[in-house]
A protein has these predicted regions:
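S-adenosyl-L-methionine-dependent methyltransferase catalytic module, highlighting the catalytic core
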Residues: 108-109, 113, 123-244
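Helix-to-beta-strand junctions that scaffold the AdoMet/dcAdoMet cofactor pocket
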Residues: 104-105, 118-120
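Generic enzyme active-site microenvironment
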Residues: 33, 55, 100, 125-128
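Active-site micro-motifs of SAM-dependent methyltransferase domains
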Residues: 83, 102, 133
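A short SAM/SAH-binding and catalytic strip from SAM-dependent methyltransferases
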Residues: 94-105
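Conserved N-terminal segment of class I S-adenosyl-L-methionine
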Residues: 1-90, 94-96, 197, 231-235, ...
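Short amphipathic alpha-helices and their capping/turn segments at secondary-structure boundaries
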Residues: 23-25, 112-116
Length: 252
């Protein structure tokens, strides 16, 4: 019998962004925020918050697209999130990482670097696909060219596969799951404040949604429930403990 707590859900697109924005606003002080892996836009509404936003991305084309489209970064850094020196230690109040970890071979190393970049008690906002869902299982086995075709013709994203645009190659380390994140937090003294599963990908009456829902239910049944069909992605708000850096011996 599973000991995992019941998963709260995000049933409408952008509902988790509203939740996360509210949590960050409640911090009630000037903030240093890092977007670790830059998307093409910034989904959080932090109106009224005094904050400085830094963006880090290994893909210079993606970073340049963000700068040209939004112009909202106070600082832009080209760097590898899994490299220890990329993120300054204990600098940020909030680190936002959205659908990036699945693209990094050393996902745990990158996550440790992010936690090290947080001030004690800082918040990590993490959005990942669940490798133990039907969606994640399928993505892990789909050839990359087919993944691009899916985005271009099924999701109807015309820029799919172009430089700086999704989808990007994926690795789906074991960490990229409910069990993986909970184990990581338990080992590293972190507290999970929010854990939400995204369900809106199988909600609605559109033909594409109905096809997706039928496929997800069927594969979940074949797996005897080992693969979840009700959610595809996960959102976490994680609080760093009050201890020092992770993954290194204390510096005297």
């Amino acid at each position: 019998m599973s000991t995992r707590p019941e998963l709260k859900t995000v049933d409408v697109y952008n509902e988790d962004a509203i939740l996360v924005s509210s949590i960050i606003k409640d911090l009630g002080r000037p903030l240093e925020i890092l977007e670790a892996g830059c998307g093409l836009d910034w989904p959080l509404d932090l109106d009224g918050v005094d904050y400085r936003l830094t963006g880090i991305d290994l893909d210079k084309d993606a970073l340049q697209s963000r700068i040209q489209k939004m112009g909202d970064l106070h600082e832009a850094i080209i760097g590898d999130l899994a490299a220890p020196a990329t993120i300054p230690a204990s600098r940020y109040d909030v680190i936002y990482n959205s659908f990036v970890l699945e693209h990094i071979p050393d996902a745990e190393g990158a996550l440790i670097n992010m936690l090290n970049g947080l001030k004690p008690g800082g918040l990590l906002v993490l959005r990942i696909p669940d490798r133990d869902s039907v969606y994640g299982w399928t993505a892990r086995r789909m050839p990359f060219r087919l993944h691009i075709a899916y985005y271009r013709y099924f999701v109807r994203y015309p820029h799919a596969g172009k430089p700086g645009h999704s989808p990007f190659p994926t690795y789906y380390a074991p960490l990229i799951s409910r069990a993986g994140i909970r184990d990581f937090c338990n080992r590293n003294g972190c507290t999970i404040l929010e854990e939400r599963g995204h369900t809106y990908y199988v909600r609605g009456t559109d033909v594409r949604v109905r096809i997706t829902r039928a496929y997800a239910k069927a594969l979940s049944a074949i797996s005897l429930g080992a693969l979840s069909w009700r959610h595809n992605n996960l959102t976490y708000v994680i609080r760093k403990g009050e201890a020092g850096s992770l993954g290194d011996d204390p510096v005297s």
